């Protein structure tokens, strides 16, 4: 069990990023009143200064994508990744060059380029990574 690649709650609590994680997870999960009880339990367990929503979050795909990217960046940092590692995971060609035989999120990348004109996930995760000042 000690070798499983998972973070335990104590690691998150002492990471300095617990608040950022909890606030974003609350906003991603609480989008209707079905989870009112869950949010109340969360509110009871969290310090008062945590910025938890007062009402379910209105679904906004753009904002949700940013919160998800911020969580991806935080967890990549907590797993000990460096910028080049994260770039490789998001898009091996970005590190190895065109023709790299490794693929990670090819379907996501192709869909986003086709639908959005860019690999948005990669851009947002790396923007969040830089915003938090990881690996600097």
Regions found by a protein language model. Give the residues of each.
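S-adenosyl-L-methionine
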Residues: 1-136
């Amino acid at each position: 069990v000690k070798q499983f690649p998972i973070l335990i709650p104590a690691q998150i609590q002492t990471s300095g990023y617990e608040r950022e994680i909890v606030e974003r997870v609350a906003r991603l999960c609480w989008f209707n009143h079905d989870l009112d009880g869950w949010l109340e339990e969360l509110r009871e367990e969290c310090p008062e200064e945590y910025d938890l929503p007062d009402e379910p979050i209105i679904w906004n795909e753009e904002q949700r994508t940013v919160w998800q990217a911020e969580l991806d960046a935080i967890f990549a940092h907590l797993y000990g990744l460096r910028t080049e590692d994260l770039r490789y995971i998001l898009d091996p060609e970005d590190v190895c060059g065109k023709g790299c035989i490794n693929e990670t999120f090819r379907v996501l990348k192709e869909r986003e380029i086709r639908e959005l004109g860019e690999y948005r996930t990669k851009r947002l995760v790396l923007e969040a990574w830089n915003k938090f000042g990881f690996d600097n």
